[in-house]
Amino acid sequence: MKKLRFFVVSDSVGETAEIAVMAVVSQFRPNFDQVDIRRFPHIQDMGHIENIVTIAKKQKAIIIYTLVKKELRNALDQLGEQNGVQVIDLLGPMMDLVEKKLEQKPLEKPGLVHQLNDFYF
């Protein structure tokens, strides 16, 4: 069995996406050791995204991402499609839905959930 690679891409620390990958992968024991997870935190620009997609293509990795900036989400989706790299957006669809329901644009500031946790807990 060949190794399955996940690239976790985030504009914050990447914990949310990594936990989601682990939740999925845990359902496929005893093959857990056949999975490689690599985290790419604090991604803020197109140059980083282009490099990650290039590496993912070479390594046949699946990209799982949590980016709050719509411009970066769209770019990653487009580059993934152009390069034949599977890309999964964990936050975008929910952010788009909440934006429509609240009729309000999101702040698009990375790391706010960590500030919230510090405030409440």
Question: What does each model-found stretch correspond to?
Answer:
Residues F6, V9-S12, A61-I62, Y65-K70, Q86, G92:
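Structural motif
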Residues A23-D33:
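Short helix-loop-beta junction
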Residues V8, R39, V87-D89:
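Structural signal for conserved beta-strand scaffold positions within catalytic alpha/beta enzyme cores
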